Amino acid sequence: MAGGRNGVKFVEMDIRSREAYELAEEWFDDVVFSYEIPPGVLDKERLKEIKKEYGNVAITLINPKPSLVKEAVQRFKQNYLIYVESSDLRVVRYSIERGVDAVISPWANRKDQGIDHVLARMMNKRGVALGFSLRPLLHQNPYERANALKFMRKAWTLVNKYKVPRFISSSAKGKFQVRGVKELISLGIAIGMEEVQAKASLSFYPLGILERLK
């Protein structure tokens, strides 16, 4: 474990493989293992095994149908975090209405920031966080990366204005995608956060989200 820096605990909220998790554990004080659910499959026994192994676990729904979001929230929110990663605004809105814990990178594969003022206000009201993920940027060409950062800045402006919970994560699927605290803080600054806001997105807000599972 990394150990608190000047009394601050840093949390990596979205790690998606064993090898990435093991590396992230060295760099962060707490790590959430994010289990990508196969399409349409919510296996209670498999989830129990993962929770027993990793402790803090997020069920991550990739481009889900609303019915799967509803099932995940109803059956599993008591013991797991629920994340939704989708560029479909209908799914994003439904997920926020259902009270998932976080929406991850809704701007991915879109030509806008993936949320608007209405959704940002709703996220504040429902306590739904916005996850700013580094991983998609790693595989983009310079033009695509510049556009993605532009949309992330617009999303951050809404998050900041409406006081939406937030976190920054590598969302790593392999150990070479894992990034440390300083690099994730740098991402926050690149999208318009002040340093203290970027640190809070790796500490204060993640710890608040994890508090629900205690």
UniProtKB/Swiss-Prot annotation:
The record's subunit annotation is: Consists of a catalytic RNA component and at least 4-5 protein subunits. Forms a subcomplex with Rnp2 which stimulates the catalytic RNA.
A Gene Ontology molecular function term of the record: ribonuclease P activity
Q: What is this protein called?
A: Ribonuclease P protein component 3
**Top EC group:** hydrolase
Which UniProt keywords are present, listed alphabetically?
Cytoplasm, Endonuclease, Hydrolase, Nuclease, tRNA processing
A single Gene Ontology CC annotation of this entry is:
ribonuclease P complex
User: Origin organism of this chain?
Assistant: Pyrococcus furiosus (strain ATCC 43587 / DSM 3638 / JCM 8422 / Vc1)
Entry keyword Transcription regulation: no
Task: Kindly list the places in or outside the cell where this protein is found, as annotated in its UniProt entry.
Answer: Cytoplasm
**Reactions that this protein is recorded to catalyse:** Endonucleolytic cleavage of RNA, removing 5'-extranucleotides from tRNA precursor
Family stated for the protein in its record: Belongs to the eukaryotic/archaeal RNase P protein component 3 family.
Q: Which Pfam families does this one have?
A: RNase_P_p30
Q: What does this protein do?
A: Part of ribonuclease P, a protein complex that generates mature tRNA molecules by cleaving their 5'-ends. The RNA is catalytic, but its KM for pre-tRNA is 170-fold decreased in the presence of the 4 known protein subunits (Rnp1-4). The protein subunits also decrease the amount of Mg(2+) needed for activity.
